Amino acid sequence: MTTVSITFDLLSSMQPRKWLKNQNFVGEITSLSFDDSGELCLASCTDDTLQLYNCISGKFVKSLASKKYGAHLGRFTHHSNSLIHASTKEDNTVRYLDVVTNRYLRYFPGHKQTVTSIDVSPADETFLSASLDNTIRLWDLRSPNCQGLLNVSSPVVAAFDATGLIFASVSERKYKISLYNIKSFDARPFQDIPLTFLPPHVRIANVEFSTDGKYLLLTTGNDFHYVIDAYSGSELLRVPSKVSTKTQDGNLTYYASACMSPDSKFLFTSYDNEHLCMYQLPELKQTVNSDHIVNSFTEMGLASTTPTSNSHSTENPLAIIPSSTSKNLLPETPSIVRFNPRFSQLVTAHSGVIFWT
């Protein structure tokens, strides 16, 4: 969790303080990740490199080349000197890289098509990978062998909750979220949540839990992102997104262009190539009624009506924040938006990385 108190005034006053771009970099950034300390930011790039940045000093640290295999979905392990990433060339192997030596420590083969998501467990040395080959795999960093395999009916993305005990998968074609117990990885999901509010042919880019476990954020390659109740699957918030997708080696790359703050109270999205929008998440009040959970929603701040599961309304942003307010900063398309989980700091990216404080 963040070590600094998060408030509306603090977030709405954020400005882009530093714009960083490797002078030799000519591609685009496709994903961002932070190490456990929050001091390092990792960017995966279309020029087959992984770029490291220091979040404290706001400086470029180093570039790690992966010219043979390509790089996407780079994620730090629980050690700042190692990371894993998906391959965009050769095959669809997930690779384990030593940041200091730029040498691979281990390979995780098995996926037959493009890897769509990678998520490291917050609890231990395991991680999930999902793929267009309709599988989800569970791995242990200490072994190249797959620890668990789920065959699903359509391409999915997957993510752990904050405890590492539960993970969610979202199916594009089945329009549902499936919740699994990590201790029974190969078993059927303990809950399936239909996503009846999703429009036809929506493309899911990413799924993530809020840190308090109450919300699930679905970012898409279509016109909207969705915040849903992690217990009931009800649509709580629908916000517009106009970030384009990019075709890479014949495959579409979808950006994680929205994120929640570490206190689970605010949502940030990229909107129109020059601005970020900030929304307040609806408060979930849970009361136990017999053997099930009943959720009631209370409006907060300036939020408008909360959509029900069949609603098609959207929320108005609490604040619209320009992505460039300084003459020293070049305008950037904020196609990726991530919140540093340890500090009150936003990071956005496209062809470079912008630090907001």
UniProtKB/Swiss-Prot annotation:
Please name the SUPFAM superfamilies in this protein's record: WD40 repeat-like
Q: Name one GO molecular function term.
A: chromatin binding
Q: Which residues are connected by disulfide bridges in this protein?
A: none
Keywords, in A-Z order: Nucleus, Repeat, WD repeat
The compartments listed are: Nucleus
Task: Reply yes or no: does the keyword Repressor apply.
Answer: no
Output the Gene Ontology cellular-component terms: chromatin; cytosol; Set1C/COMPASS complex
Q: Does the keyword Nucleus apply?
A: yes
**So which domain of life are we looking at?**
Eukaryota
Task: Summarize the subunit comment.
Answer: Component of the Set1 complex composed of ash2, sdc1, set1, shg1, spp1, swd1, swd2 and swd3.
Q: Which family does it belong to?
A: Belongs to the WD repeat SWD2 family.
Functional description taken from the UniProt entry: The Set1 complex specifically methylates 'Lys-4' of histone H3.
The protein's name is Set1 complex component swd2
